[in-house]
């Protein structure tokens, strides 16, 4: 959905997850857009989840829906203790509970071994190349990260931050106020 189609819902962001050298980094921009207006430039859309902060997560989409998903996912993570199992259990609930079916958000989650996208339709997708990019600037950030991975020796954290910066130069719903978390 075009972020500007419903001016009453907070939309749009860019989140990327990159793996290199045994490290994983998740980065996100700080812009919150309501319709055609930038409401905030320093939102924190990336956080650590789990008892010991062993999972990194970022969200794109409607902010209230994303916070609901963060809470539900973290509860599954606390219960099952393993990223993939928690994601699958959340997806099962998403498909069976009517109230969850209307959530307009995506989650990008990663631990030391696995990166997953949890979609608004209850799908769980593991990217084949270990890179996740979601949100309005996702394809720009994905392209930048792939190029930087292929042609530089930069670490995962630097690549993730630079990919968000590049997306922020192109996508009007993304800014260059980057938050990065790394494992």
Curated annotation (Swiss-Prot):
It comes from the Bacteria. It catalyses: ATP-dependent cleavage of peptide bonds with broad specificity. PROSITE patterns: PROTEASOME_BETA_2 (PS51476). Its main location: cytoplasm. Allosterically activated by HslU binding. Coiled coil: none annotated. Keywords: Allosteric enzyme, Cytoplasm, Hydrolase, Metal-binding, Protease, Sodium, Threonine protease. Gene3D superfamilies: Glutamine Phosphoribosylpyrophosphate, subunit 1, domain 1. A double ring-shaped homohexamer of HslV is capped on each side by a ring-shaped HslU homohexamer. The assembly of the HslU/HslV complex is dependent on binding of ATP. NCBIfam families: ATP_dep_HslV, PRK05456.1. This is ATP-dependent protease subunit HslV. It comes from Xanthomonas axonopodis pv. citri (strain 306).
